Amino acid sequence: VVRQVGLPGTNTGAREGDSYGIDTGLPTGKNPVKVSFPIFLWPKAVIDAKSMTSKNAAVRGADHLSHNIKFIWNTQGNTLINQHGGINQLRKILEDDKLVETIVVVDNQMTPSAKFADYVLPDTMNQEIDELEGDAYAVGDYNYLIACPKAADILWDQRPNFEIMREMAKRFGVEDKYTEGRTY
């Protein structure tokens, strides 16, 4: 905008570079669903998914989406309402049971997204579980893990996300495949 890109002390407005040399996630296995689209287009996929194509909506794995989203599982994100423009339009979409039939939110706070959920599953807070914290998004080339032992016991009925998903896998008959013999 001010023609300063590339001059000393300036940049493009993007965040500084970072490299993610440590992958702290669990293996994901093979996903039988091959079709995907950018997450921030989920409202369009709820209302009119069939109009979303590889050319106009970056659909991958197919030329277009074949059906509207009817079920949303939102984990620790609060992305249903506060990460998008047009909050009033999103509210109407989320409140219409004919559009999204079921919304599940997993979080440790009653976020704006959780207020639209049919089911809220209580997650733990970082201080209640042993964790390995990985590289943050803005620390440059310093790849590391920090051991974070729990500082407090889990209160009430919260469960770590791994345990929530283990229970779901158990109910679908794939618990052993999900856990691969591991426990949390």
Region annotations inferred by a language model:
Residues 1, 9-184:
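Non-catalytic alpha/beta scaffold blocks inside enzyme catalytic domains
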Residues 4:
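Short, solvent-exposed turn/loop segments enriched in Gly/Ser/Thr/Pro and often Arg
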